[in-house]
Curated annotation (Swiss-Prot):
One of its GO terms (molecular function) is rRNA binding. Belongs to the universal ribosomal protein uL6 family. This is Large ribosomal subunit protein uL6m. Component of the mitochondrial ribosome (mitoribosome), a dedicated translation machinery responsible for the synthesis of mitochondrial genome-encoded proteins, including at least some of the essential transmembrane subunits of the mitochondrial respiratory chain. The mitoribosomes are attached to the mitochondrial inner membrane and translation products are cotranslationally integrated into the membrane. SUPFAM superfamilies: Ribosomal protein L6 (SSF56053). It comes from Saccharomyces cerevisiae (strain ATCC 204508 / S288c) (Baker's yeast).
Length: 214
């Protein structure tokens, strides 16, 4: 590994540990708990291994979410001030520091998810391009120029709305699930660089290319 690569890695780990050390603020309507897994497992990556032995659960008005975490992560609750600190056993260990910021971000996303929810907005750009809900909102029919019927079943925990034929709103507690479903719908027609037709997610933009003239 070169000096520059080591430098970039150390900066990335430092930033992640900075994120990990930030407190999480929770409202009285949110409950965060950590419990031992009944069936812990070992995950190996290269020469390192992690014992996934705990489950963090976040409950709120909009639902309940959980994330499985390694044994070296802990939660320090400060109920008086309504905050939680995520800590690790050894903040000097690069693998623990890397997971520190990642898990803290996941928990924060879950807290937002069970209180406010997460959104993804899809825009359909192109003549006749649109989305339509069928089967009482359980199926998204996508029309993007294909002659055959295309679409996806709406996963459990996801709500889809169509404020306009060319717009789709995906809502859910789990941010990863919301973005994954949006990405799957986008695959039916990713934005193309010549006319700009396609399915755009959130603030996505593309740079149009000039057509090659033979």
């Amino acid at each position: 590994m070169s000096f520059i690569q080591r430098r970039l890695l150390s900066q990335t780990l430092f930033l992640r540990s900075q994120v990990g050390s930030l407190p999480l603020y929770i409202s009285p309507e949110v409950q965060v708990s950590i419990n031992a897994l009944s069936m812990p497992r070992i995950i190996r990556k290269g020469r390192t291994s992690m014992n996934i032995s705990q489950n963090i659960t976040v409950k709120g008005p909009k639902g309940e979410l959980s994330v499985e975490v390694p044994d070296f992560l802990h939660l320090d609750k400060d109920e008086k001030h309504g905050k939680i600190n995520v800590t690790v056993q050894n903040s000097e260990d690069k693998h623990q520091r890397s997971m520190w910021g990642t898990v803290r971000s996941l928990i924060n996303n879950h807290i937002i998810g069970v209180t406010e929810g997460h959104l993804a907005v899809l825009r359909f750009v192109g003549t006749g391009y649109r989305a339509q809900l069928e089967n009482d909102g359980k199926f998204v029919n996508v029309k993007v120029g294909a002659s055959i019927k295309q679409g996806l079943d709406v996963p459990e925990g996801i709500v889809v709305k169509t404020p306009a034929p060319t717009s789709l709103i995906i809502e859910g507690c789990n941010k990863q699930q919301v973005l994954l479903f949006a990405a799957k719908l986008r695959k039916f027609h990713p934005p193309e660089p010549y006319k700009g037709k396609g399915i755009y997610v959130n603030d996505e933009t593309i740079k149009l290319k000039d057509k090659k003239i033979k």
